[in-house]
Design a protein with these regions (language model features):
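Alpha4 helix (beta4-alpha4-beta5 surface) of REC/receiver domains from two-component response regulators
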Residues: 69, 82, 92-107
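Two-component/phosphorelay signaling modules centered on CheY-like receiver
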Residues: 14-36
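Acidic, metal-coordinating helix/loop segments flanking the phosphotransfer/catalytic sites
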Residues: 35-55
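CheY-like receiver
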Residues: 123, 127-149
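C-terminal output helix
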Residues: 113-122
Length: 149
């Protein structure tokens, strides 16, 4: 398990998950990439992690479950799971857009995924954590107050 900001990909189509992983490995260096095809295995992995921060790339339909079910299931361990998620869909209908809005998911990509769109979405989420890390390094009083949480 890395000490960085890992990316967790959940897609019931193994080839899609592996393709997304290969694209991300071309530009992402801040953590490890984990790919899951089974929702329950992904949930168990996430709940068992020491660190409750990651970027999630999740298919909206995962066999018998939804990507939103996955995010809800890990939310106690990962309070920002919805904010740190990129939902992918074969058909981004109004219903899916509305589910994203209702769930606080800000990134929705339609298959086939454009590599630049994926990179920009991952970069936006990563940027939030890099800014926070900079603030911790520059402000020792703030860092101490965060460590007491």
């Amino acid at each position: 398990m890395s000490n960085g900001l890992d990316i967790i990909i959940v897609d019931d189509d193994e080839s899609v998950g592996e393709l997304i992983s290969r694209v991300i490995k071309k530009f992402y260096t801040w953590g490890d990439i984990h790919v899951f095809t089974e929702v329950e295995k992904a949930i168990n992995y996430c709940i068992g992690r020491d660190i409750g921060v990651a970027i999630f790339i999740v298919d909206v339909f995962l066999g018998g479950a939804s990507g939103f079910y996955f995010l809800d299931a890990i939310e106690e361990k990962f309070p920002t799971a919805h904010e740190d998620a990129i939902i992918i869909s074969g058909n981004a209908s109004d219903d899916i857009v509305n589910m994203c809005i209702a769930s606080d998911v800000n990134y929705l990509l339609e298959k086939p995924i454009k590599p630049y769109a994926l990179q920009l979405a991952v970069r936006a989420i990563t940027g939030k954590y890099l800014e926070f890390a900079k603030k911790l390094l520059k402000d020792p009083v703030f860092a101490e107050s965060v460590s007491k949480l």
